[in-house]
């Protein structure tokens, strides 16, 4: 009886040791699991390295705004262009900040700072003192600083490209134009103010003048005479029915 019990116990132990071990029953700390985790980590590291190298070889395309800003910053101007006084104009200013108008808007006042390149400041025009008689202009005008002028007509009648921003000594300056134009072509129903409408037809119109401005000629910056609005005048025409 005891011999039979020993035989059954030995057969049971042999069956347990002979059973194959499945990979699903491997403990978490077993060498097989460690090899798999090391392999996946190595593959992940290689993938990150490959993607990083790909990004360096093929960088992401830049936005259009970034390209425009870069192109503006690349337009470098020689400071010698500003040393000749004949190229300076009282209606053209290079500055890093917008210049203000005077309070009465009858003269030009520039910012008194070290950033302004154009030191040729036009003196204020002397105006007669306003009395109680009620003096009025024939035409109403408005004067503004124009900062984003990109195109203009030169003295030869050709359309040229005006430089909006200028890179000088690693600092960006903007080119401003002081322009004057008519506020209204007919300040009064009959046309210009103070004109005898019984004998004359009249209206207000904006006139232009030439100023030196910095323009682009191919890939080079050059001075050119361009037309800008500079005044508002009254045009009168005699009525033909009086003849």
UniProtKB/Swiss-Prot annotation:
Major localization class: secreted
Secretion signal, residue range per the UniProt entry: 1-18
SMART domains for this protein: NGF (SM00140)
Composition bias, Basic and acidic residues: 47-66
PROSITE patterns xref list: NGF_1 (PS00248), NGF_2 (PS50270)
Subcellular location: Secreted
Glycan attachment residues as annotated in the record: 148, 151
Disulfide bonds listed in the record: 139-204, 182-232, 192-234
Propeptide: 19-125
GO biological process: cell surface receptor protein tyrosine kinase signaling pathway; modulation of chemical synaptic transmission; negative regulation of neuron apoptotic process; nerve development; nerve growth factor signaling pathway; neuron projection morphogenesis
Keyword hit for Disulfide bond: yes
Residue ranges, annotated region (Disordered): 47-67
Assembly notes: Homodimer; non-covalently linked.
Designated name of the protein: Venom nerve growth factor 3
Organism annotation: Tropidechis carinatus (Australian rough-scaled snake)
Lineage per the UniProt record: Eukaryota, Metazoa, Chordata, Craniata, Vertebrata
């Amino acid at each position: 009886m005891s011999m039979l019990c020993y035989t059954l116990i030995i057969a049971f132990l042999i069956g347990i040791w002979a059973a194959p071990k499945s990979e699903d029953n491997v403990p978490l700390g077993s060498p097989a699991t460690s090899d798999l985790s090391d392999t996946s980590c190595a593959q992940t590291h290689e993938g990150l390295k490959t993607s990083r190298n790909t990004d360096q070889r093929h960088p992401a395309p830049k936005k259009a705004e970034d390209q425009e800003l870069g192109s503006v910053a690349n337009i470098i101007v020689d400071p010698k262009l500003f040393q000749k006084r004949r190229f300076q104009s009282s209606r053209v200013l290079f500055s890093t900040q917008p210049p203000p108008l005077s309070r009465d808007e009858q003269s030009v006042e520039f910012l008194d700072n070290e950033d302004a390149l154009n030191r040729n400041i036009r003196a204020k025009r002397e105006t007669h003192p306003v009395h109680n008689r009620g003096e009025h202009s024939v035409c109403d005008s408005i004067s503004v600083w124009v900062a984003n002028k990109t195109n203009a007509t030169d003295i030869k009648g050709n359309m040229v490209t005006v430089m909006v921003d200028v890179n000088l000594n690693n600092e960006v300056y903007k080119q401003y134009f002081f322009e004057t134009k008519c506020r209204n072509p007919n300040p009064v129903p009959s046309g210009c103010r103070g004109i005898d409408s019984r004998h004359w037809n009249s209206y207000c119109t904006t006139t232009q003048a030439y100023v030196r401005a910095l323009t682009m000629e191919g890939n080079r910056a050059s001075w050119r005479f361009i037309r800008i609005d500079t005044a508002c005048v009254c045009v009168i025409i005699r009525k033909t029915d009086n003849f």
